[in-house]
C-alpha cells in the first residue's frame, strides 16, 4: 500500500540530509510505529507519506514514494485527502476554525458532503470518540490534550484509509492515552492503515504490528511487535527508547531546604478565563525553596492555567499569589517566575539556538557565556547551536526552551509538560 524506495531528503537550508536511503514498505491494515531520538527523522517520514514532502516542504529528494502504486510526486496532497488523514505533532498548526464543532466538520464541508450525511458523521464522531463534552467549545480555551483530541476527531470524521499520527499522545494524560489506545484499536478493527511516530510506546503494545527504529535519518532496525515485546527493559533503554510496558514511578525521598518563608504561596485561588466559570478554585498550597512539586490531573483540569497564573501571564479570578510572603500583582510575577510552555514555539524568538540562550542572559549583569556551552552540552544541543529554532524537531525545541529556563535567574521555574516531546535518553 505504501512503498518508500531508497528515499533521501534534505530540507532546503539544512546542512545535512534528514533522510538517507530509506526503504520502508507498509501493508494495508498494518500499524507501524516509528520511534527513535528527537530529530532522527520520524516526522520527515510522516511527511513523505502524507505527501507534504515534496509538495509543501522544499528540499532535495531522491528515490520514490508511492501510495497504492501512484507516485506521490505526480499528485497533490488534496488528491489524497480521501485516502490519508494526518494529525500533526502540534495540533494548533492544523486548525482552521475557532470552535470545536466547526473544526470537526471543516474537512467534510470542503469535500462538499451533503448536509445530512455531514451531520450524521459529525454526531457519530462525537459518540464514538466519547467527546460530547467538547461540543461547542472555543478552541483557544482547550488544553493541549483536548486540542490533540479535536485534531484527531477532525481526521476521524473524514474516514480515511490511512491515519498518519505524529506523537499523538504527547499532550495527553494517562486516562486520555488509554482512550487514544481504544480509538486506535477501533480504527485498526476497521481495517485502517496506521503510521504512528511516537516516543511513548507502552500504549501501543497489542496494537502495533511493527516497530521501526530511526537513527540520524536512517532506518536502523525493524522488529515485528511480538519480537520487540521480548526485549528486556534494559535492552530497550540501551536503544534510547521508553519502555514498551507500563511503568510505575517510584519517587525518591528528598528533604527540601525548608524555612519559614515559602518561595511561592497561593491562598483561596480561583483560576480561569474572565468570561467563564473558574477552571479550578479554592486552591491553597505552599512551595518552599529547593522543593520540587508535581502538578497532575486530567486534561483540562487547569494545570496549564495554574502555571500561567503563577508566572503572571494570566490574571487570577480571585485569591492571592505571594512570593516570599509578599503579594505580587500578575504583571510583576513575570520577573519572579519563568514558565517553559507546553508549546515551545511561543517562546523561541531568535535565529539560532545559541542566540536563544544568549538572549536569556540579556538582563543579567554577569553574562557568563561559558554557561551557555555547558547547557548546550548538558541538553545534547551543541551540534544544533547554529540551527534556527523553528527548524528543530519538537523535542529539540523543548530542550532549547528548558535551556533558556536554566539560564534565567528566576526565583521559581515552572515546566508545563516538559517531557512531552522527549525520547528516553534526553528525558533522563
State where each predicted segment sits.
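H-loop/switch region of ABC-family ATPase nucleotide-binding domains
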Residues: 198-199
Amino acid at each position: 500500500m505504501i512503498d518508500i524506495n531508497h528515499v533521501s531528503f534534505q530540507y532546503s537550508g539544512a546542512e545535512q540530509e534528514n533522510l538517507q536511503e530509506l526503504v520502508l514498505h507498509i501493508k494495508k491494515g498494518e500499524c507501524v510505529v516509528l520511534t527513535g531520538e528527537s530529530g532522527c527523522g520520524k516526522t520527515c517520514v510522516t511527511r513523505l507519506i502524507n505527501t507534504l514532502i515534496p509538495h509543501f516542504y522544499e528540499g532535495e529528494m531522491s528515490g520514490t514514494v508511492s501510495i497504492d502504486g501512484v507516485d506521490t510526486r505526480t499528485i497533490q496532497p488534496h488528491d489524497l485527502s480521501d485516502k490519508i488523514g494526518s494529525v500533526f505533532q502540534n495540533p494548533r498548526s492544523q486548525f482552521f476554525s475557532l470552535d470545536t464543532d466547526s473544526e470537526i466538520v471543516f474537512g467534510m464541508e470542503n469535500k462538499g458532503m451533503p448536509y445530512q450525511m455531514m451531520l450524521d458523521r459529525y454526531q457519530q464522531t462525537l459518540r464514538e470518540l466519547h467527546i460530547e463534552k467538547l461540543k461547542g467549545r472555543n478552541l483557544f480555551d482547550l488544553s493541549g490534550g483536548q486540542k490533540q483530541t479535536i485534531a484527531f476527531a477532525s481526521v476521524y470524521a473524514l474516514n480515511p484509509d490511512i491515519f498518519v499520527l505524529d506523537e499523538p499522545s504527547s499532550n495527553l494524560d494517562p486516562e486520555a492515552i488509554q482512550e487514544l489506545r481504544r480509538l486506535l484499536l477501533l480504527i485498526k478493527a476497521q481495517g485502517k492503515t496506521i503510521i504512528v511516530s511516537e516516543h511513548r510506546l507502552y500504549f501501543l503494545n497489542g496494537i502495533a504490528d511493527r516497530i521501526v527504529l530511526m537513527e540520524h535519518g536512517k532506518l536502523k532496525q525493524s522488529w515485528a511487535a511480538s519480537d520487540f515485546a521480548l526485549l528486556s527493559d534494559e535492552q530497550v533503554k540501551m536503544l534510547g527508547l521508553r519502555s514498551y510496558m507500563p511503568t510505575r514511578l517510584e519517587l525518591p525521598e528528598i528533604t527540601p531546604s525548608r524555612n519559614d518563608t515559602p518561595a511561592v504561596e497561593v491562598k483561596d485561588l480561583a483560576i480561569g478565563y474572565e468570561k467563564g466559570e473558574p477552571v479550578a478554585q479554592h486552591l491553597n498550597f505552599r512551595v518552599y525553596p529547593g522543593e520540587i512539586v508535581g502538578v497532575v490531573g486530567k486534561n483540562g483540569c487547569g494545570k496549564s492555567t495554574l502555571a500561567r497564573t503563577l508566572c503572571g501571564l494570566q490574571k487570577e479570578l480571585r485569591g492571592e499569589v505571594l512570593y516570599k510572603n509578599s503579594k505580587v500583582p500578575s504583571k510583576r510575577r513575570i520577573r519572579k517566575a519563568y514558565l517553559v510552555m507546553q508549546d515551545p514555539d511561543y517562546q523561541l524568538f531568535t535565529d539560532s539556538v545559541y542566540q536563544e540562550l544568549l538572549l536569556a542572559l540579556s538582563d543579567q549583569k554577569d553574562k557568563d557565556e561559558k554557561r551557555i556551552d555547558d547547557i548546550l552540552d548538558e541538553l545534547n544541543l551543541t551540534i544544533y547551536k547554529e540551527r534556527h529554532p523553528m527548524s528543530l524537531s519538537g523535542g529539540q525545541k523543548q530542550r532549547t526552551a528548558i535551556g533558556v529556563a536554566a539560564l534565567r535567574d528566576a526565583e521559581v521555574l515552572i515546566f508545563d509538560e516538559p517531557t512531552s516531546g522527549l525520547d528516553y535518553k534526553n528525558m533522563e
